[in-house]
């Protein structure tokens, strides 16, 4: 694989940027990641995200939307529990004006009560809509973090948000702009486009990010936990590693893929052999700093609980014998070249890698590190996960 078109650099304001130039393509993708420690009222950062779409200098929401439409490119944004991300993909000839629009949105400082009253009903409806879905497994995973700042709701409570002080909203907004800001650009961009990034995002005043120590919390350590009642069960098996190192963080994606992705994955083969023919097994992992939570979720009837739970130990042992490399390498290593031709996916991949490592990671770094994985090495990392704090949740319906 040729990574000569990939570049990592520091902007003069301290922000990090990774770029991947592909002059044979017709599109350019751009993403900006704004990390934060969720110290404020739950939902405030999500509120700030909505406000960013209300004003951009003299332009109001209708004019912002009209500009995006005229270029055939929509700026999207989302808020996670620990960062905010904005991204877009467009034709090369409209990249610079679209970049300037996003920069103007994010550097807007003044908002009116009218702006706030426009976004609150949208947020209220978003919360209302999310309540229609059974998100209890996700709620359980949120609650597992030992630092409770990361277990708060991203959307928040609309009634509480209606009364949040303007000063708190402004303070949360300012806390986004630190030297941990990361920019990712990929595709057919020119030198003039890079200079535009320097002249816009490279000129935003950034401060050092203060990361307060984790709060000491009461920890849920019971091996078996029940949530709700009913004859249908979601079984959520979780593993919690407190001091995950660089290798384990890099290996987590490979382990999840080998164990749970596709019908030839280890979990499907094991549980099928034990009489459980699952349509899907939802394997997942999340990383916050040095905490890693690895999990999988299956659906069973309540009467099958006594047969399934003893298999959790058996799966841990069977998974050690997985042919990890043959299952995963074609997808996660050899298929990295697919990203060369898809700027939007490449920028999303950079964001995912940043989320896992809490730092920007180039494709070359990922390929060089993960390309040397062996079955024995990946099995050892799985053993480390399997021997960490395990908690099983029976979520009834």
What is each residue range found by the language model?
Residues 1-64, 170-270, 390-397:
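His/Glu-rich zincin catalytic helix
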Residues 57, 63-210, 241-243, 251, ...:
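Charge-rich, well-structured scaffold segments of protease-associated domains
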